[in-house]
Amino acid sequence: MERYLPTGNEMISLPKLNEQTAAIEDLTFLSMQQRGMIELCGTENVPLMQPFIQIDQEELALTGLQWSREHFWIPSGHKETEQATVKFTVLTPVGERGFAMRLSVTARTDCRLKLGARGLWSKSVHCVNEEKELTGQAYIYESAWNSSFIMDYRVGFPAFALAPMSDHAGKSEWAQTEDGISYQISCALDAKAGQEEAFTIFWGLGFEEVAAATSAKEQLRRGWDWLYRKTADWLDKRTVQLPTPELTEVYNVNQFFCLFYATGRTFDTEELICATSRSTRYYVSAAYWDRDSLLWAFPTILRADAALAKEVLTYVFTRQRQNIGVHSRFIDGTMLEPGFELDELVAPVLALQAYRSKTRDEAFLQERFVQDGLSLILARLREARHPDTALYETFLQPTDDEIVHPYLTYDNVLVWRALQLLADWRPAQRGSLLAEADAVRAAIFTHCVKKDADGQPYFAWSVDLAGHHDVYDEPPGSLQLLPYYGFCERTDVIWQNTVRMIRSADYKFSFAGKPIAEIGCPHAPWPWVLSLCNSLLCGHAEQALRELTIMPMDNGIACESVDADTGECTTGSAFATCAGFLCHALLTACKEGSSCGTI
């Protein structure tokens, strides 16, 4: 399996920086007008961007670089050869509409260097879960704006453009063929033994020629050192130190992946959006889920950047408000996949409470658009309530798969908590909302608690109020999280019996006894990373921390599920919102004093 080192900023994502070849295989950015993500690609044999180094006219293979993530986010590979020490670094500067790639060489003898990048822009793709190739026309041409070439795409008018500028006078070459647009940017340098020589290419993105070229020029004027320092300072300010280097790396790599891949700004309207992932390697990329963004990613976003968290909530209660509780949506808020999901309906309430608790920003709660959103949530809750019993139905489960029975215990626990919060925020309705919350709690214990063959009580996964129920659990919305949401204590016998059942080797989707002893489900029948998160939050942290130290996941980044023996990714690579929940669960477990090193 290919190993990638994704990086990116608010505007640009580079999901496929290949460790083995040092190639940048694709580049993505968000478009509000197109309701999703645009990806620029090379081919299987010729990447979009390939750095190269020639020493005395002999090309040095950039395979097998030793890679690191500087400041837990900036990919940098180095290599020692008989001729030189070489380094390749990719920087996606915060606040910039572009990125930079830098090659540096310290030769062992005096020599002639040629440093640069070449590549092929073969196609452009629209991505929202599925990929559809665009049918406009790509162009490349010389421009006085950057003293090099501009690559742009037109659909009768400009759609987007990409422009390079370099910190050394060099040579730009290009050609347009049936395979696409090929190009090369290079400079020649005379190197002295032991003296570092470097070449940086700044790439700018824009709507058209001038916007792209000046985005590159802005970076050039600032310079590599300034951009690097600004970005490193931004990353360092948000870096969290955990008791061991291994856990510190897991946390921070996944934190920055969440911040930059679960949120982003559209290049055309510059609006903040939330998405499952800005990587096309995730199978439902560039779309919005309330659950994913607000229950999983939001806690980590909030800890890292309260201002960003406020912007996320503003996006949710404005752009996304009309379809809160609907399965999935485009980034502009319109419906993508229909289907009512109860946990998603109340997710904004839980995220809003987390924000209030962290910031004490009571004024935000009183914003008209927030109040309108809360009123809409209450109205939709009323529609989902059973006419006689205080339980609320859903059509889809937390995996987005169809229900067996309509009343999910986990979902109704979230409703109970949301009603409590809404009662605090709405004094005029406080009495009725608290009464309803109490009624939901009572209904859960009356209708959702069953007994096993030995007469021991447990929480059913779902019920139909006609005597039927199922014993089941889903990592995206687990019964293990009931104490986490405050519904019961970890000492509660019913909850303990429930957890024992679903973690037992007798349970169909349990991987008890395996190195990764987590839980799966039919949606992905392998151990889920979200299950590991649940373990961190429900009193099984020591086991989960041991697993985490041996799980490669997706080259260190959270994925949907992993192999039970190796911990390698099996499904759902580059799962950005899950990365956020992993960070939140890990930090919570550390604060609770779980053992792994000295926590």
PLM region spans:
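Long, well-ordered core segments of solenoidal/helical folds
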Residues: 254-266, 304-327, 369-390, 435-455, ...
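Extended ligand-binding clefts on enzyme/binding-domain cores
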Residues: 287-290, 376-379, 386-387, 405-414, ...
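Well-ordered alpha-helical scaffold segments within catalytic/enzyme domains
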Residues: 237-242, 294-307, 347-364, 413-429, ...
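Beta-strand-rich N-terminal accessory domains
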Residues: 1-56, 74
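Aromatic-rich carbohydrate-recognition surfaces in CAZymes
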Residues: 284-387, 412, 573-593
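Acidic/polar, glycine-enriched structural segments that form the non-catalytic walls/loops
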Residues: 85, 91-286, 597-599
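C-terminal catalytic domain of Rieske-type non-heme iron oxygenases
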Residues: 329-333, 517-519, 546-579
